[in-house]
């Protein structure tokens, strides 16, 4: 474990739909564009990919397409999380069989497990399938918080766990994960607003929503921070700030898919209970995309 490096700018891919079905041709085109733009890795079937409303067959189609299209040019991470440990194991098995380089496991949502329950959940998954695991902590969606002390315990006892996507937006907690865990443990932010400060603290990159829209800018931001060119990095951070804010003006991935439709990268379609962006927020998003030159005025 640990040979694969999950670092830099990694895009949490959207899932394009067309008349209720997955648009695989569009998905492959998006993946190819991401790689052409220099992205460092891809997450398929994560939160941004509307994983909650995918069937097993659709999950297989998407992971298979992502692995095939990347052709090992960048690492592929498969979202495999569930609040049902047995289902999480099943998804992990599928991802491994289809050739994913790693799996992303969100903390179980709704059940509200204790820290011991979280530890046992990840330990059980790792005991069944040997594949690099990234933990995923996003309390705003799950209703539970994976504490830094628990992360450190997991890393010590479960060698399959090679990193974490921390989407708390809490820099103190992010810092403690780095402090408590061994050197080489890969700590990525899942919050586009905190790419700059989190990497200065020692994080190794981001699993990003905004890189669906501006992959090259996010790649450059991460690269500049790694090279300690902080003044240039700050400029990109502030250039991206208005767009970052709009990505969460309504539930992810509603704004990002809307932006991609305005860029003519996909047809705008969601699965319920997600619905289209409100008219007022659509106008704000369209205006911002025009102002920063992503779409023509």
Swiss-Prot record:
UniProt pathway: Amino-acid biosynthesis; L-lysine biosynthesis via DAP pathway; (S)-tetrahydrodipicolinate from L-aspartate: step 3/4
Class of enzymatic activity (EC top level): lyase
Key words, A-Z: Amino-acid biosynthesis, Cytoplasm, Diaminopimelate biosynthesis, Lyase, Lysine biosynthesis, Schiff base
Protein's UniProt keywords contain Amino-acid biosynthesis: yes
Residues reported in the UniProt entry to bind pyruvate: 48, 207
Protein location: Cytoplasm
Recorded superkingdom: Bacteria
Active site: 136 (proton donor/acceptor), 165 (schiff-base intermediate with substrate)
InterPro entries in the record: Aldolase_TIM (IPR013785), DapA (IPR005263), DapA-like (IPR002220), Schiff_base-form_aldolases_AS (IPR020625), Schiff_base-form_aldolases_CS (IPR020624)
Catalytic activity of the protein: L-aspartate 4-semialdehyde + pyruvate = (2S,4S)-4-hydroxy-2,3,4,5-tetrahydrodipicolinate + H2O + H(+)
Enzyme Commission numbers on file: 4.3.3.7
One annotated Gene Ontology cellular component of this protein: cytosol
One BP annotation, GO: lysine biosynthetic process via diaminopimelate
Feature type site, description Part of a proton relay during catalysis: 47, 110
One MF annotation (Gene Ontology) recorded for this entry: 4-hydroxy-tetrahydrodipicolinate synthase activity
Protein family according to the UniProt entry: Belongs to the DapA family.
HAMAP family registered for this protein in UniProt: DapA (MF_00418)
Subunit-level organization: Homotetramer; dimer of dimers.
Its job: Catalyzes the condensation of (S)-aspartate-beta-semialdehyde [(S)-ASA] and pyruvate to 4-hydroxy-tetrahydrodipicolinate (HTPA).
The protein's name: 4-hydroxy-tetrahydrodipicolinate synthase
Source organism (scientific name): Lawsonia intracellularis (strain PHE/MN1-00)
